[in-house]
């Protein structure tokens, strides 16, 4: 299953549209005013299905992931001197690849690819292609990508 993750150009808070391969909107992500990033994820019908919330007052950025109201894990920035690294505490997943900006994989506890993420270049706004192996992992994979993108935005500001 492929998803196209596109940030809206003119939005006050972080806002994204997530599209299916056929161009239909799968999810809409709306940032909320809060301490740290708080991203609410809505399905195509407008129902809230998940939240990515930055935990504030931590030494390194940490994002909590919620499916509905249920906590499913977190993603934390690691202290690495030469390239960004992340620890994922969600579904036993790991993230590997080029975090500097663009291409990485989300791996299962067994080392299988759960999702492949690549940034599309020469776009007006941040645009990523997320290729998910199992459609059941689409929303958690999207939340990991949102957390990494939010951390990169904070780092670049």
Show where each model-derived region lies:
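Intrinsically disordered, low-complexity proline/glycine-rich segments
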Residues: 1-157
